[in-house]
């Protein structure tokens, strides 16, 4: 990928730990509404309590049997997905106008960062033009998805982001049609010889994505947004 992205001055990376979905979503919206043209971009790294989130294109029939897992109607793009412990969620709060990034270019950056992260563990992954996310093909030639994407643009700024399955209980995915695709197989890095923990994966993924977008200074923070 050879995107011509101007160098960005500063990125703040926040480590949120494990959080419920709704308060983090509310904080993303507030951050985006209140930011100015001088506000540094932020990445938020988080693991969520178990939750299904419906995107703006989500259809009720893709929620097969949510059971006791709550369902949240979100304002991100895409359809239904599952978040839970052991999954790396990276929210990207980027001023795309300042970065001179199109939405498609930002999606490409997200997918490329994931693919580069997996390549460091000799996992050959790929993106698909007609179905955002990152996929692998197993030894039987069957395709499986291990990362989902969903963004929202407001005031020329992005929020929401990506979810990469690391080492989690995968059974909740069987109770939905992931991303609106019936029978979509899901997998995770720990089953492919890749990162075994969110902590192991997030350092690589954050560095890859920050490099692609071109941040000159990266500051880490553990505080609540």
Curated annotation (Swiss-Prot):
Record's protein name: Octanoyltransferase
Residues annotated for substrate binding in this entry: 76-83, 148-150, 161-163
Keyword set, alphabetical order: Acyltransferase, Cytoplasm, Transferase
A GO cellular component entry from the record: cytoplasm
Signal peptide: none
Note: In the reaction, the free carboxyl group of octanoic acid is attached via an amide linkage to the epsilon-amino group of a specific lysine residue of lipoyl domains of lipoate-dependent enzymes.
Keyword Acyltransferase: yes
InterPro entries (UniProt xref): aa-tRNA-synth_II/BPL/LPL, BPL_LPL_catalytic, Octanoyltransferase, Octanoyltransferase_CS
Pathway: Protein modification; protein lipoylation via endogenous pathway; protein N(6)-(lipoyl)lysine from octanoyl-[acyl-carrier-protein]: step 1/2
Family per similarity comment: Belongs to the LipB family.
Source organism per UniProt: Aeromonas salmonicida (strain A449)
Residues in BPL/LPL catalytic domain copies: 37-217
Gene3D superfamilies from the UniProt entry: Bira Bifunctional Protein, Domain 2
EC number(s) given by UniProt: 2.3.1.181
Function: Catalyzes the transfer of endogenously produced octanoic acid from octanoyl-acyl-carrier-protein onto the lipoyl domains of lipoate-dependent enzymes. Lipoyl-ACP can also act as a substrate although octanoyl-ACP is likely to be the physiological substrate.
Catalytic activity line of the entry: octanoyl-[ACP] + L-lysyl-[protein] = N(6)-octanoyl-L-lysyl-[protein] + holo-[ACP] + H(+)
Subcellular location: Cytoplasm
Enzyme's top EC category: transferase
One function term, GO molecular function aspect: lipoyl(octanoyl) transferase activity
Principal subcellular localization: cytoplasm
Positions annotated as active site in the UniProt record: 179
BP GO terms, sorted: protein modification process
HAMAP family found in the cross-reference section: LipB
Gene, per the UniProt record: lipB
Site feature: Lowers pKa of active site Cys: 145
């Amino acid at each position: 990928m050879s995107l011509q992205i101007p160098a960005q001055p500063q990125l703040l990376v926040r480590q949120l730990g494990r959080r419920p979905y709704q308060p983090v979503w509310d904080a993303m919206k507030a951050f985006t509404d209140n930011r100015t043209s001088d506000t540094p971009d932020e990445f938020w790294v988080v693991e969520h309590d178990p939750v299904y989130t419906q995107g703006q294109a989500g259809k009720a029939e893709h929620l097969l049997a949510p059971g006791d897992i709550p369902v949240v109607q979100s304002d991100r793009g895409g359809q239904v997905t599952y978040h839970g412990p052991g999954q790396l969620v990276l929210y990207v709060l980027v001023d795309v106008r300042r970065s001179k990034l199109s939405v498609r270019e930002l999606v490409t950056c997200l997918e490329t960062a994931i693919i580069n992260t997996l390549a460091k563990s000799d996992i050959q992954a790929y993106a698909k033009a007609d179905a955002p996310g990152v996929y692998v093909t197993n030894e039987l030639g069957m395709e499986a998805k291990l990362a989902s994407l969903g963004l929202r643009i407001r005031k020329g700024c992005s929020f929401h982001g990506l979810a990469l399955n690391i080492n989690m209980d995968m059974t909740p995915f069987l109770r939905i049609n992931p991303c609106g695709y019936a029978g979509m197989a899901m997998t995770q890095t720990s089953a492919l010889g890749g990162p075994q923990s969110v902590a192991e994966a997030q350092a690589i993924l954050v560095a890859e994505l920050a490099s692609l977008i071109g941040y000159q200074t990266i500051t880490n923070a553990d505080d609540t947004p």
